A protein has these predicted regions:
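Beta-propeller blade termini and top-face loops
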Residues: 1-249, 257, 264-281, 287-343, ...
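The canonical Cys-X-X-Cys-His
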Residues: 182, 193, 225, 677-692, ...
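Conserved RecA-like P-loop NTPase ATPase core
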Residues: 190, 677, 702, 743, ...
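Gly/Gly-Pro-rich "capping" loops immediately C-terminal to redox-active cysteine motifs
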Residues: 212-213, 585-589, 695-719, 731-776
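Long, ordered, helix-rich scaffold segments
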Residues: 215-221, 228-680, 691, 698, ...
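C-terminal capping alpha-helices of c-type cytochrome domains
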Residues: 295, 632-655, 663, 739-741, ...
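Short glycine-rich, low-complexity segments
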Residues: 605, 714-723, 727-728, 732-733, ...
């Protein structure tokens, strides 16, 4: 159904669920979108109904609030599903498998990091002690382990912190152990499903030449289920408790979430008798927060919760109950007492409760919202005095509903320095020319700080605006331009362009001057960057020469990066050839951006391949992981491009020194000696690498290299230029006084460059003293180490490195 399910035989109920998680009721045939889906396997829910998700590299995300509140409006954040891990490294979290690792068939750089996270579980079993309450459990099916994070509040959302430092709750040396799902049982213990497969990777992501050597079905009949329990812990639940009404209500206070949810489900299975309703109303006064929570929901869904009872829940001492009571209150907002209480809760002491209060007010029917507009705006303005994160900002703007321009105007008039995030969020939600004109008029006549005006204009310039005919907006823009700095002028020029209005004379004059000012080294770097923003709107021919001059590594980094950004927006094939010609002179950071320009803009593929074929660009500098290789090998319609790329590398990877690797392969089967390996490391590697407490920090630290397979480590030793982190490319720096230094760029900023040489010696040179800085295109690590190592010495070194640093 292409992600658009409907009830059998009733196509009128079709609902677009693409990219969404959802829930449904069989008896009422009701479907409801929950919110954005991570796309991964598993969905965890805590005792208060908050959802946690997982997907491959991103092991734990929190659905901060459901999409139903947004209704397709453009918001400050594009996603309400937020990565909450506080232990990320370059976009994913480090994990600690045990035993000798297999070679990765793709993305070897992901070894030792989450890449197959799944089966997420919020543990609510209550059987493992307080230490494991409020924990998230996530399996990594690739690295054969189960990881545990502790969940704590973080503003209106949460953060996930590692429970065990440099180790996992469960890890296996059996490479066929594939945990894919977990669930809490009636006993409060965790049940783990082990899919058990020797090969877990999807065939699409296994290079064909490697796939031919693998048995993709190995282990498929050996799946199993494990139970994780705590010694001395026993279940305190008797299933007979479910046989009586009193037992069901009492079960709502059980420490095991499974028991509570099952009792809740059974109580909701039929209409409530007076006896059960009476028991639940008594439970609202219980000392147990879980029983109060479930009683409130059951009574409300059965239509038996009174206004006074709900008001009591809205004042509950437990934050999670107040949060849930606000969701219940959405059906009671036509009651003045409830509405007044919800408005007052915009200033609740808890940040997440404040967010939910605003979200609840966003559901207020239009007529009632208009009737209460003045009072609403008063409470919303007061709420801006509270500490806020982006989620609070978004919820406040949603609560404003159609009165956003009134809220914008009142904010800038009543508050000396209103939060620019709120102003920008309001701007994002405007949907017609009249609202745009009102916003611009308010800006033109305001005394807002320049930084706030700048942010609002930047937000507007990034929106899609329809063309406009009339003088009102023109007059407002001219009013703002009177005191505009270069960054503001640039944003206004973009806005004018989108509206179909001509650029102002002030902008035209300033942008012409900017061509000279960008290269004026007497100006501060920040002022020069502002001049770059003015240049952005000029035709490419007028700024072409300037942009390439800005790529020189003697220019400030921000200038280089802005130049490459502007070049990336143009579609002139000669740009690629010019960049390749300049390749050796590009700084390390700029070269990373330039490599993406050459690879991901197809008109530059010929320039890229020519540079690789001629050796101007070292193949290792392009970080050709599987997806980047396939951009040239598979995902282009240009047959010639595919053929040229296939001569440089295969789908399986980049190998420059196959003969040397084949000659040393027997070392992989020899028994290594760690003590002898330590001697080899000291003699061959320690001059540039740190391992444990030994060595010099020039190249990458090898402290965690044991997360890689022996085969992968040997490949990196013998073929150091097949894939080089651009931070470790060798450079030649020549000073104006004639000094020459060769090493890696250890530090590069707008003022100076630090070169680190073999052995760890560092030299720092001011940019003004640099005559030339050029890339040598290769790793500082030399090729040919196989000439100084026997196969046994290689085996010893590999064993030493895989053993783990002390």
């Amino acid at each position: 159904n292409s992600g658009k399910p409907y009830w059998w035989g009733d196509t009128a109920t079709v609902m677009d669920m693409r990219g969404q998680d959802f829930r449904f009721q069989l008896d009422t045939k009701k479907m409801e979108r929950l919110g954005e889906s991570s796309g991964g396997y598993g969905l965890g829910m805590d005792p208060y109904g908050r959802f946690y998700e997982t997907h491959n590299l991103e092991h734990v995300s929190h659905l901060v609030f459901p999409d139903r509140y947004i209704n397709d409006r453009t918001m400050l954040k594009k996603h309400t599903l937020s990565n909450i891990s506080d232990h990320e490294e370059n976009g994913t979290s480090r994990i600690y498998p045990i035993g000798q690792q297999d070679s990765r068939v793709n993305h070897p750089e992901q070894s030792g990091y989450f890449s197959g996270s799944c089966g997420i579980l919020h543990y609510g079993g209550g059987a493992f002690g307080k230490e494991y309450d409020q924990t998230i459990w996530v399996a990594d099916v690739v690295l054969n382990l189960i990881h545990v994070d502790k969940i704590t509040s973080d503003g209106a959302s949460f953060k996930a912190s590692r429970m065990h430092e440099k180790k996992e709750f469960m890890a296996s040396t059996d490479r066929s152990f594939r945990p894919v799902n977990m669930s809490v049982g009636p006993d409060g213990f965790i049940y783990v499903i082990d899919m058990h497969r020797k090969v877990i990777e999807h065939p699409e992501w296994i290079p064909d030449e490697i796939e031919d050597s693998l048995d993709l079905d190995a282990g498929k009949t050996e799946g199993r289920i494990y139970r994780i329990n705590k010694n001395g812990s026993a279940s305190g639940f008797e299933v007979d408790q479910f046989k009586t009404n009193e037992g069901l209500v009492n079960a709502l206070s059980h420490p095991n979430q499974w028991v509570r949810m099952t009792a809740h489900q059974l109580l909701m299975g039929s209409s409530l008798s007076d006896e059960v309703a009476g028991l639940l109303k008594q439970t609202l006064a219980s000392n147990n927060s879980f029983s109060r929570l479930h009683a409130m929901w059951i009574l409300s869904l059965q239509g038996k919760l009174t206004t006074d009872q709900l008001l009591s829940c809205l004042s509950d001492k437990e934050q999670g109950i107040r949060e849930n009571a606000l969701k219940v209150a959405e059906q009671y907002l036509n009651d003045d007492k409830i509405l007044s209480k919800v408005m007052a809760m915009l200033s609740d002491k808890d940040q997440r409760v404040r967010m939910q209060a605003a979200l609840g007010l966003s559901t207020l029917p239009g007529t009632l919202a208009s009737e209460k507009e003045k009072l609403m705006l008063q409470f919303l303005i007061q709420a801006t005095d509270q500490s806020m994160d982006d989620w609070n900002v978004m919820s406040l703007v949603l609560a404003v509903k159609e009165k956003r321009t009134s809220f914008f105007d009142k904010l800038i008039n009543d508050k000396k320095n209103p939060d620019p995030r709120i102003l920008s969020s309001i701007v994002l939600s405007i949907n017609d020319q009249q609202e745009l004109n009102t916003i611009l008029q308010s800006l033109a006549g305001s005394s807002l700080p320049a930084s706030s005006v700048k942010q609002v204009l930047k937000t507007l310039s990034g929106m899609k605006l329809s063309s406009y005919e009339g003088l009102a907006i023109m007059a407002s823009l001219e009013g703002i331009e009177k005191n505009a700095d270069p960054a503001m002028l640039s944003s206004i020029a973009v806005i004018r362009n989108q509206l179909g209005l001509p650029p102002s004379l002030k902008f035209i004059t300033a942008s012409k001057k900017a061509i000279a000012q960008v290269l004026n080294k007497e100006l501060s770097d920040s002022l020069r960057l502002e001049q770059m923003f003015l240049v952005k709107m000029l035709p490419f021919k007028e700024k072409e020469a300037l942009l390439f001059q800005c790529l020189r590594n003697t220019e400030p980094l921000q200038i280089q990066e802005e130049a490459i950004r502007q070049l990336s927006e143009e579609r002139d094939p000669k740009i690629g050839y010019r960049i390749v010609d300049m390749w050796k002179e590009l700084g390390p950071q700029t070269r990373r951006y330039a490599s993406d320009l050459l690879l991901y803009i197809e008109i530059h593929h010929d320039a890229l391949l020519t540079g690789l074929e001629k050796g101007v660009i070292n193949i290792g500098e392009m970080n050709f992981d599987l997806e980047r290789r396939r951009t040239l090998l598979w995902w282009t319609d240009n047959t010639k491009t595919k053929q040229r790329a296939a001569k440089l590398f295969s789908d399986a990877g980049v190998v420059n020194r196959q003969q040397a690797i084949e000659k040393m392969k027997p070392a992989l089967t020899l028994t290594g000696n760690a003590d002898q390996g330590a001697l080899v490391f000291a003699n061959v590697c320690a001059n540039c690498h740190v391992y444990g407490s030994k060595g010099n920090s020039v190249g990458p630290a090898l402290t965690e290299i044991n997360r890689k397979s022996k085969e992968a480590i040997m490949h990196e030793i013998l073929d150091p230029n097949s894939a080089v982190d651009t931070r470790y490319i060798s450079h030649r720096l020549e000073t104006r006084s004639g000094g020459i230094h060769i090493g890696i760029v250890a530090l590069e900023n707008d003022r100076q460059v630090t070169i680190k040489k073999m052995g760890g010696t560092e030299i720092t040179v001011l940019r003004s003293d640099i005559k030339q800085l050029s890339s040598l295109g290769t790793s500082l690590m030399m090729e040919g180490l196989e000439g100084s190592l026997t196969q046994q010495q290689m085996a010893d070194l590999l064993h030493y490195l895989q053993k783990g640093a002390n």
